[in-house]
Each structure stands twice: as C-alpha cells, then as structure tokens.
Amino acid sequence: TDERKQELSNHYASVVSRITAARARRYAKTGVDTPVTLLGASKTMPAEDIAFLMRDCGLRVAGENRAQEFAAKYDDVIAAGGEYHFIGHLQTNKVKTLIGRAALIHSVDSVHLAQEIGRQSLAAGVTTRVLGEVNSGCEASKSGVAPADARAFFAEIAAIPGIELAGMM
C-alpha cells in the first residue's frame, strides 16, 4: 500500500539521517571520515518491502538470517538492484542454498563450515566471500571462535579454495 511505502521511506530516511549525523560528529572530533554501509535486515519483512527500499529509497545491501527465506526472497531483491547478504547462523546442510547467490556470508563460525562453503563454491565454479565470526564476549550462547583463536582461525579459512575471507564479524 502507499501508506506502507511511506512508512518504509520515512524510516529509511531517518536511519540514513542518523548515520550521516554520526559520521559528521566523528569527522569533527577526529578528522576521519569512515564510509558506512547500511545493511537492511530483511528478517520477517516481505520481499516487496526490501525491493521497494532498494529500488525507490536507495538501500544497496539487504541481509537475511534464514537460508530458506534468503532463497525465497533472492530473485526480488536482486531484481531491485541490490546486494543480498546472509547474516544468520548457517548450518552446513543449508550452504548450497547460498552459493552463487549471497554476495557475502557474515557468519562463518567454524573451519568445518568454511570447508563446506569452499567445497560447494568450487563445485559451482564461484568464489564465496565470507566473514569469520569471533565471539568477542566468549559467551556460551553465541557462535564464533574465541578472540585468542581468531588469528589461526582466519589463516585456516583464508587458505580454503573457493573462499575469499573478507573480514570478521
């Protein structure tokens, strides 16, 4: 509906305004202007809403936290002209759903998962960009490696064919 589109547009503009103000404050304080990429989490949102934000409001990157939802929304999001990232916990049996589709997988929390992503990527003839997940608070309820193990974890992931380690989460 037009009302829903206006609501989405207003909310998006508000978020962009807050980001712009925060960047300006940081620049005034430090003299450093750091680029920011806004990722719209599409959790529970219909594909039409994400497509509208991309097509009409300027959102460039969306992220989904469930592999099945990612697959269901993929065509609409890509048709709107944006990047689609996977931002949730990923099980090895769901990897195939994302290969060749996800511009970036944010949540690689084990070497075993990275190896499966690499294997599936090679089979599809693509390279998959990933972020290694660090559990900075060492919380049992969170995924990722302990900070003390991060360097070795990243080195191991970076050596896996079919994967490009793009950073950490």
Annotate each predicted stretch with a short phrase.
Residues 1-169:
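Conserved alpha/beta-domain cores
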